[in-house]
Curated annotation (Swiss-Prot):
Organism: Canis lupus familiaris
Cofactor: how and how many bound: Binds 2 magnesium ions per subunit. Is also active with manganese (in vitro).
Tissue/organ expression: Isoform 1 is detected in heart, and at lower levels in brain. Isoform 2 is detected in heart.
Basic and acidic residues composition-biased segments: 18-32, 68-79, 164-184
Binding site for Mg(2+) 2: D477, I478, D521
Gene Ontology molecular functions: adenylate cyclase activity; ATP binding; metal ion binding
Cofactor: Mg(2+); Mn(2+)
Gene, per the UniProt record: ADCY5
Reactions it catalyzes: ATP = 3',5'-cyclic AMP + diphosphate
Lineage: Eukaryota, Metazoa, Chordata, Craniata, Vertebrata
Cytoplasmic side stretches: 1-244, 398-765, 1009-1265
Name used for this protein in its record: Adenylate cyclase type 5
Annotated positions binding Mg(2+) 1: D477, D521
Pfam families in the cross-refs: AC_N, Adcy_cons_dom, Guanylate_cyc
Keywords carried by this UniProt record: ATP-binding, cAMP biosynthesis, Cell membrane, Cell projection, Cilium, Glycoprotein, Lyase, Magnesium, Membrane, Metal-binding, Methylation, Nucleotide-binding, Phosphoprotein, Repeat, Transmembrane, Transmembrane helix
Phosphoserine PTM positions: S113, S168, S669, S757
Amino acid sequence: MSGPRSASPPGCAATRGGPEHRAAWGEAEARANGHPHAAGGATRGCSKKPGGAVTPQLQQQQQQQQHEQQHEQQQHEQQQHVQQQQRLAKRWRGDDDPPLGGDDPLAGGFGFSFRSRSAWQERGGDDCGRGSRRRRRGAAGGGSSRAPPAGGGGGPAAAGGAEVRPRSVELGLDERRGRGRAEPEPEAEAGAPGGDRGARDGDGPAGPGACCRALLQIFRSKKFPSDKLERLYQRYFFRLNQSSLTMLMAVLVLVCLVMLAFHAARPPLRLPHLAVLAAAVGVILVMAVLCNRAAFHQDHMGLACYALIAVVLAVQVVGLLLPQPRSASEGIWWTVFFIYTIYTLLPVRMRAAVLSGVLLSALHLAIALRANAQDRFLLKQLVSNVLIFSCTNIVGVCTHYPAEVSQRQAFQETRECIQARLHSQRENQQQERLLLSVLPRHVAMEMKADINAKQEDMMFHKIYIQKHDNVSILFADIEGFTSLASQCTAQELVMTLNELFARFDKLAAENHCLRIKILGDCYYCVSGLPEARADHAHCCVEMGMDMIEAISLVREVTGVNVNMRVGIHSGRVHCGVLGLRKWQFDVWSNDVTLANHMEAGGKAGRIHITKATLSYLNGDYEVEPGCGGERNAYLKEHSIETFLILRCTQKRKEEKAMIAKMNRQRTNSIGHNPPHWGAERPFYNHLGGNQVSKEMKRMGFEDPKDKNAQESANPEDEVDEFLGRAIDARSIDRLRSEHVRKFLLTFREPDLEKKYSKQVDDRFGAYVACASLVFLFICFVQITIVPHSVFMLSFYLTCFLLLTLVVFVSVIYSCVKLFPGPLQSLSRKIVRSKTNSTLVGVFTITLVFLSAFVNMFMCNSEDLLGCLADEHNISTSRVNACHVAASAANLSLGDEQGFCGTPWPSCNFPEYFTYSVLLSLLACSVFLQISCIGKLVLMLAIELIYVLVVEVPRVTLFDNADLLVTANAIDFNNNNGTSQCPEHATKVALKVVTPIIISVFVLALYLHAQQVESTARLDFLWKLQATEEKEEMEELQAYNRRLLHNILPKDVAAHFLARERRNDELYYQSCECVAVMFASIANFSEFYVELEANNEGVECLRVLNEIIADFDEIISEDRFRQLEKIKTIGSTYMAASGLNDSTYDKVGKTHIKALADFAMKLMDQMKYINEHSFNNFQMKIGLNIGPVVAGVIGARKPQYDIWGNTVNVASRMDSTGVPDRIQVTTDMYQVLAANTYQLECRGVVKVKGKGEMMTYFLNGGPPLS
């Protein structure tokens, strides 16, 4: 094929001299939108209910609803259309223009794009050397008209051109196609990872059974099914568990020391028992040292935990067997302490914690039963003890399960964030490779920066153009390609082109050339881009020689007489992209035009060069006169001296041999042969052998060995490996010191604290329920062991009703469907607000605490010592336990009758008030959403109030109990018949023991609360970092995807990015009925000139960019959603419709009518541009319909193309057309005429390659009804 092709500047001979080559111009984007088209318009009606007849009234209502919905849809589409017009008008309309309204003749029908009159007048022809108003326009517009410096990869500032409108419009991004994401719920809290996982309106359980299962589900935690994942989880929390274990050992040492002190304070001393307690302290201290050594491993954690449980059991047994006044209530406090700390601070699984808690409880009950079997009140004490131990175990479970679930959930969410990040990273790398295979890195990076940058609403679009001097441009055309294509099927044609251009791409990489575009059977590339090279002319000549050699192989294999015609010229180029959609990297300049004509005026199998190129070759090649002017009018007109390469000189042969030898040595040193190049090699899997050239590295290509190894890895293993490295690398101490305050445990950064405070704990209802359960246990304990009173029953009933109401309102959040809206709203306000939930939690804990000791005020508070002293007429200091036994009142622990003549009942077991207060402290620890400082303040308040009550108004209650317990333990049978009081054990007074044990509990619970909150905050911080990294990667991925979808059709990009596709899978499809349009500005070549005043033609390209941008905005309108922009070549705009199932309307042919409407809209738009820019651009448009073949060719730089007779004829309709007219074929005429479009017959037109054809002019759309 011969004739020039327009790949160079707008207005080169391509728009006129080579229309036959436009058949292969293509890069169509298949619409993947959410607007499926139905023939005849979309109708939405009400569906008929099954089983019922449709009455006429119902039919009428349905029809009315359909009409109303259609009317609303039309209004919505009209509103979108007006908004699109307003966006377009921002640049074209001036203050003196009439407003866009119903009376404006230019506002109806097609919705024009208006530009400011002053902007066009001041630019007009000046920017192309026709006046002196350009500088005024630049000053008024606030931007420079200069092109960005060569090699610049900056953002908007680097380009200097004026930015335009929001970035979604600036970069040609179709917003209506990106609305798949759901809008966030208005009441949902934002900004915190983890978010609100609670129930929402409209979701949640549907019945009471499901609601109960949902409540039970929050306390379930299972081992991960994968052993590897479970080990990662253990590693994830190993340091925290190690810290928790050390903390537990410290508090156990404290408890053992307290037990030793209590035993040492009361004679007689038993050294064996003291030795066991001291040995336990020593063992725990040794274990604490070992657990904090660097050699302590994750596998040692379980062994240390079970060893500690064994030590606790030994201490439990020894503590209960110590000589003391026997009592079934002795040892309850440390048993409760041991049980709870095993659940909360010991990092063991639930089964081990439950077994340990049950065993400790059983040991206490068994030893108490054996030692106090003769007590007639033992049953009440044992029942109370069972209730206390049961409550402790339940609270332990309620604390252990949510904590473990939270930890496992935090681990799982962190892993999911990392998994999503790595997945996004892999996809992003694929997108980067695909993107950078189409656009050079500096252009792609600048576009992505502009997407992310906030842009001002300015007059003109940014133009991505850079100027490069001293480059060589090569054009190569396959002579005889038409006969080759005629012998191939659609698949064979795609495979042949793919194989051929894959070889050319490989040769271009080896010869340091950058392939620009493939135009049908024409291939052109540039050397000296993106990085300048001194040997750019040599590279192009060598590339041409290799291409001629490669085509000879095709000739031998196929038997078809095909050959290459190569033309080369050296000079200056402008490179970049134009328009808003379907970008393709291209070059423009008069030198590119000349190179194009050098190929057209060349000879088959020869390299045709200009004198400029010859001057760069330094005599390394033998040449002969080319006489190009004899074969090409352009060369003759411009008196271009040309030459044909004969052969390279001996010097050049030696240099080439040396380079080849070095390449072989480098290949051998790598250790394997380069892979065979074939068409089936996907473009991003092939990097031209074993190495990547410097130019390709600059364009984003990686080493194939590293990439293949990366892609072959299992994604799950990759996630686990990455997480393992991150776990090993993170430092808990460093994170705490950098981000968290030491005592308050608040984040140092206010934003972090704000995000953390917005987290919603959807287990709040379970916390309230657990605290209410503690209240019930306290009630049962008090009812069992404390004398009954009306006040007791009324107070407990009141508290029960209040707590039931609180539990009811809190649990509604997890069962939203069962209750009315106001209750749901109240529950959400409580649960979703940290302040409200904290206040409700404090209220609940207060009720539980009051229920623990308020009955104390109903007990007899008389001083038993004083009564006995008066009875025996002795001083109170001489009263002992034997006086109790000798009292005439027959006092005993089991007697609830008031003594000393008072009517108030006797509460002989006041220590159970203390144990109830301990249970209320445990209820305080259940509320995980309350901060550790808040818990500390609350627990100190509880301790202070209770200790004041014990030590001041009700101290005699505890003194009396001490005396009665001692008396009850005296064995008078061993007195040998004497009247003396036998020797008996003494005990530390309860009024001394009570503050100590409560302080120990407060300390342990505070340490646990600090550990829980510290763990939660560190998990939040780590997960936040993982989430932010994931979001950054997703944001980068979104930028790449938006750019990528603006270059390749979405289905084509998805095809190449799919991991599961085969390497030998080509992309091609046959389309049954496609409408194709070519629209060219016929006289743009007259407008384009390269002068110093217009920045060597850049300002002319800026004008073309604005025109193409207007066309791109028009094709983005919703009514043209069936259309696809294929590409722009110079000043020619190519579009098609019906390329996929979502845009092809087989019955209604609406995709054909849409393309005809679009063509008329372009004509009207061009007229208006001429009116306001004082230019006289003339547009010719050609339309045709028929079958096409769509596919992707090019291994290194994929290019979506459409081929077929339909495309060829559409191109001929443009090239043979008349300025300012739309020419259509007979097939197109039949479809449009059947839809009442206004057409007129032009007559018979001679078309190259087709002979004579009857054609028609499209004058207008259907008449308005």
